[in-house]
Amino acid sequence: MARSLKKNPFVAFHLLEKVEKLNIRKEKEIIVTWSRASTIIPTMVGHTIAVHNGKEHLPVFITDRMVGHKLGEFAPTLTFRGHARNDNRSRR
């Protein structure tokens, strides 16, 4: 279910502060965050944000096509290791 248009998109306050500070200084640094639920807004375009996936921070370069999506969409949390082998010989 989508967020109501009456409300603004959710962006963690500390993340918004860091992005605004870098925009004012016109610097590009990697911003480390645990806030996977934050929505990507146009002021974040061009920055690299390291999003936590539960184990490590994955760097995500923000482009204009990502605006409106959540940060967590670009940092997968699960790794598929393959299905279990069909090893019937070991069970007998």
UniProtKB/Swiss-Prot annotation:
Gene3D superfamilies: 30s Ribosomal Protein S19, Chain A. Keywords: Chloroplast, Plastid, Ribonucleoprotein, Ribosomal protein, RNA-binding, rRNA-binding. Pfam families: Ribosomal_S19. One of its GO terms (molecular function) is structural constituent of ribosome. One of its GO terms (cellular component) is mitochondrial small ribosomal subunit. It is found in: Plastid, Chloroplast. Its main location: plastid. InterPro entries: Ribosomal_uS19, Ribosomal_uS19_bac-type, Ribosomal_uS19_CS, Ribosomal_uS19_SF. One of its GO terms (biological process) is ribosomal small subunit assembly. It comes from the Eukaryota. Belongs to the universal ribosomal protein uS19 family. Protein S19 forms a complex with S13 that binds strongly to the 16S ribosomal RNA. This is Small ribosomal subunit protein uS19c. It comes from Ceratophyllum demersum. The gene is rps19.
